[in-house]
């Protein structure tokens, strides 16, 4: 949301304070099917279930910051971004003094399914201190419009019309252009924190650059073409949407290892390796029980899958490609085994 704020401030800095007419949001760069946020795991309000969108903002999520005020007996709630047309409860009562923090989200008894209203029926334990709760907005299609209008008005801007979706006419000269972060920065955010929707955005962009239209079919075709040109004899992956948040995506451990070997020889190898979580240090591996700093590995976990893949830095000075994929109803129990495998590989003497 910082980038949207800076963009609107930049617009106002050019002397534009009043927009007569509408703000038109053009999200036609991506052509993706309708998305059911509850389909994967029945948790539609979890930000990780957000759908890819050419104008995705803040993962279609609202960050609610709760700040307890013991003297007033309540917690104040700050909302980011401020969504236009949404009633937001400003405070919630504090729980009885001495109440343990515990499951504070459940204690709040939030009502988040109404696109026009955010409400809480419960209480907030002061012992929790300041906490942030990020929840997906229930009407993803209107999120960008509400966020743009809400932030524009919060910055003091005026709008005589509305914010709506549409296609910008060809040939218009941009007032200014905002540049995205470098690809290495995007990949780092995807890999360090297993950001599924960002992975899908990047996947679709493969098709956009190659075909001028971003579809999942086009992205899969672009990946197959790349794979065939470089790893033709290895079994190609079968991605569904470009992310690990899938029950249908497939890749063999051998094929993934071949790809990692190829990547090690690439000129952009340093950027790829630095994007991977470091065992016991950061990202999704910060709590790993493996010896800290011995490996750069991407993790993957679903209810019946546990996996790691990447590079292990051994005591001998050698570098090993490591791929381990566990498919089992109790796959979560394999985490200590995978940690032990990483340590065993690192102790190669």
Features from the language model and the residues they span:
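Conserved serine DD-peptidase/penicillin-binding transpeptidase domain
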Residues: 1-234, 340, 347-348
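Small-residue-rich helix-loop
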Residues: 193, 203-349
